């Protein structure tokens, strides 16, 4: 019987994902990718999720200071093979070098939406004044 696909990532997947994230971050910080858009944009890599066979690495990135994230994501995906080659030296222990894919990280937007909902007057009214005082103590 095969493993369910929605199971939590293994310790190995998490460890390799963190190593790939650190390697990609170093490549971007050193300016090794020759693309004007990537060079002038500050890019934050929040997470790298590995496939179960460790052959695909999906990097969730947040371009800071840029309104159009899609163009930065597209530029990163255009240079994904080059980045894959550059991180190979840091990941020599891996049998296969993972294919790198870049996706927009929407988790910060989701956090802001949840925070705005929790601070909305409707939710504050439902909580009542007594519950707010208990949380502060």
Swiss-Prot record:
Binding partners and assembly: Monomer. Binds 30S ribosomal subunits, but not 50S ribosomal subunits or 70S ribosomes.
TM stretches of this protein: none
PANTHER family, sorted: RIBOSOME-BINDING FACTOR A, CHLOROPLASTIC-RELATED
Source organism superkingdom: Bacteria
Pfam family, one: RBFA
Presence of the UniProt keyword Cytoplasm in the record: yes
PROSITE patterns xrefs: RBFA
Subcellular location(s) per record: Cytoplasm
Major site of localization recorded for this protein: cytoplasm
Annotated InterPro entries: KH_dom-like_a/b, RbfA, RbfA_dom_sf, Ribosome-bd_factorA_CS
Lineage: Bacteria, Pseudomonadati, Pseudomonadota, Alphaproteobacteria, Hyphomicrobiales
Family: Belongs to the RbfA family.
GO cellular component, one term: cytosol
The species this protein was found in: Allorhizobium ampelinum (strain ATCC BAA-846 / DSM 112012 / S4) (Agrobacterium vitis (strain S4))
GO BP, sorted A to Z: maturation of SSU-rRNA
Name of the protein described by the UniProt record: Ribosome-binding factor A
């Amino acid at each position: 019987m095969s493993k369910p696909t929605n199971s939590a990532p293994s310790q190995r997947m998490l460890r390799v994902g963190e190593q790939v994230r650190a390697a990609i971050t170093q490549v971007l910080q050193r300016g090794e990718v020759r693309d004007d858009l990537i060079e002038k944009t500050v890019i934050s890599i929040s997470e790298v999720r590995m496939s179960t066979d460790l052959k695909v690495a999906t990097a969730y990135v947040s371009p800071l200071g840029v309104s159009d994230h899609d163009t930065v994501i597209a530029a990163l995906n255009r240079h994904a093979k080059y980045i894959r080659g550059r991180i190979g030296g840091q990941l020599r222990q891996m049998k296969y070098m993972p294919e790198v894919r870049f996706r927009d990280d929407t988790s910060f937007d989701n956090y802001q939406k949840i925070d705005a909902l929790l601070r909305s007057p409707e939710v504050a009214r439902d909580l009542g004044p007594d519950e707010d005082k208990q949380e502060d103590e």
